[in-house]
Amino acid sequence: MIVLNALSYLGIVLGFIGMTVSIASALYYISEFVEEHSRLAKAFLCRLVYFIMAVMVFLVIFDGFPFWLSAFSIFSHYIYKINFDTFPFFSFKRMRFLLACFLIVANHILWVRFFQVHEFPIKPRGLTYDFVGQRLLTSRASFSQVASFMGVCVWSVPIGIFVSFTAADNTLPTITTPSSSSPDAYSSGSSRRTSNVLRQAYKKLGIFVERSLTSLGLSDRSSERYV
C-alpha cells in the first residue's frame, strides 16, 4: 500500500496546513472585530472570566479538582480581569500585566502536570477506596476532556488578550517616540509613533494566503484573467 500510505501522509500535511491557516484567519477576524467593537469585546471577556471562575468552583465541588490549584487559577483570572481597565490598550511596563503573563505560563504548566499524573475514578465522585477496602477503578482524563478544559478555562482569556493587541494602532510599544507630557503616553497616540507588529503580521499572512490561493487557481482574481 505504497500509494495509499503516500496519500495518507499528504492528507495529514494538507490537513495541518488547512488547520493552521484557519486558526490564523480566525485570529485575524477576531482582532478586526475587537477593533470595531472594543466595548462589546471587553464586556464579553469580563463575563467570560466570571464564567470560568464559576466553572472552576463546580469542578472542585462535583469532580474533585484540587482546591489550591483551582484557587490559583481563579486568582489568575482575577488578575487578567483587572488588566481590562485600559482595554484594548495594555502597557508592557505595568506590574499587573507582567504578573498576568507569568500566571498564563504558570497555569498552563501546572494544569498540564496535573492531567499527566492525576487519575479520576470511573464511578461517580467519591473516595478512592470503597468500604471493603478495594481500590476503585480509575482512569486519566481523555484527550477531548483535557483539550476542552485547557481551551476554555486556561487559554480562552489569554487568547482574547493576545488578539486585542491589534485593536488600536498604539497598543504595542515596539518602535515609539515617547512624549514628555504624560507618563502614560502609550494610549495617547498623538505624541509618538508606534509600529504594530501583530497587525502587520496578520496582514502579511492574509496576503500570503491570497497569493497561494491565486497560484492554485482558487481565487476569484485568477479567474478574472481568463474572462
Curated annotation (Swiss-Prot):
It is found in: Golgi apparatus, cis-Golgi network membrane. The chain crosses the membrane at residues 10-30, 48-68, 97-117, 146-166. GO terms for biological process: endoplasmic reticulum to Golgi vesicle-mediated transport. Keywords: Golgi apparatus, Membrane, Transmembrane, Transmembrane helix. It is a multi-pass membrane protein. InterPro entries: Svp26/Tex261 (IPR007277). GO terms for molecular function: COPII receptor activity. GO terms for cellular component: COPII-coated ER to Golgi transport vesicle; cytoplasm; endoplasmic reticulum; endoplasmic reticulum membrane; Golgi membrane. Belongs to the SVP26 family. May play a role in retention of a subset of membrane proteins in the early Golgi compartments. This is Protein svp26. The gene is svp26.
